[in-house]
């Protein structure tokens, strides 16, 4: 289990109800879901002690792969359903790995002597990674193993309760109060529905989706806008010479520093501020953002509520990104957007795209306003706050949606590329079907294909040699026993896993494209075979060929 795999595994990133791929909350692992998280004072380790802690985690096998081997698939996948009993049963042996799994994965206290066999306990207590509770120790922060794209063993550090049971949280011992120094009890319990603006989440479906779709070509500068616990910055240091991570929440910046330090992956520059304020006139080759995109009636939780009405935060990010991109640079973000009765959502989003930028917008899911409100009310723990309070907040959400004319909310991702073109390519897709991550290279290839189509007129297209992309299959649809199919579907096995309906001429054309003959010569041969006028076929087919190239079914052969 590598390449962006966290422990425990998230539900499939494109799952609906809840759509884990596009959420700021990770409800994958668990303990009792009673509506409490903790916001301890953060660890303040030095480099040497952090290195020793990292070596202890590696020595014990506290990695994504190690946990899967320890727990076994049934217990491991049960964590995704918020069930911890199988994992607790699998960690009764007292080994160093079992102790670490209980401490950091299940967030259960372990005896001091057992922890001593796995960790430099006194250093961890002094630095705030662990808290002493009599003869036991417990974790001060959430430490989640995460598999890097090239087999690296990384760890994401966040507030307790955010990866175990979601923002709704886990039990907090009664003696945990604010104000304790590192190494002592010092947490704040959070009851269901209570505001906690400083909460910092760990790795979840949204963050891993963004990491998967990000273009990973080597760049000079990358910006992680709204870094949270630092997962995007962690990825970026592997292919960017200089990484800047920003967040409005100072605790998030501190957690991101801990994530990079504990993972030993590289360094980044951290700046506090909202949106593009910390970087002002600076430009970047890559901007990534998993912003607080939730469309809510009021900003209660910094990690999810951006403080702007409706989808204004996402629109602002898109519109302002161009001035911070270098030529050819990418901006990639997750977003929610409103479906209103007054405008088509595709037209609304296309209008956000700044001039001089190509765009690829993909809507992965849609929820009506009642589903959407219920999703985020549960996320905040409001369903545990009492019937009257829950009803009042539910009503406030629906009142805000009615006031704004919002009928539904879309979930998806937006990629911009600063091309400088006077005729930019703006593609708006609705694709709720499974895809194959990582998609970063598929995103890069999408824009390369748009460049090709933009500079190639129909006459030149017919002189181009094309080949069928790898992993394209043909399906014939029609009643049993029919001599000819009603229609033909081309389907991709990889990447976006698109499907395109074509006629028999289009299917035959695609099947002959092997990189040896020009498109025009293939059409002439098909016309002769079918007894059609080749001039008519040459005039009719470029539109279909452009569709097949644009969606990646056919690839131009260079040279």
Summary of predicted features, one role per range:
Residues 35-99, 135, 163-166, 421-511, ...:
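Acidic, low-complexity/disordered tracts enriched in E/D and polar residues
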Residues 250-251, 291-316:
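Mobile active-site "lid"/loop adjacent to the S-adenosyl-L-methionine
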Residues 196, 204-289, 295:
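Conserved SAM/SAH cofactor-binding pocket of Class I
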Residues 1-32, 179-184:
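Compositionally biased, low-complexity flexible segments
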Residues 96-142, 209-212, 242, 416, ...:
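Long, charge-rich, low-complexity alpha-helical segments
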Residues 369-447:
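Flexible, glycine-/basic-rich loop-and-beta segments that form/coincide
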Residues 111-202:
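Non-catalytic substrate-recognition/targeting regions of SAM-dependent transferases
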Residues 249, 310-363:
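Conserved Class I SAM-dependent methyltransferase catalytic core
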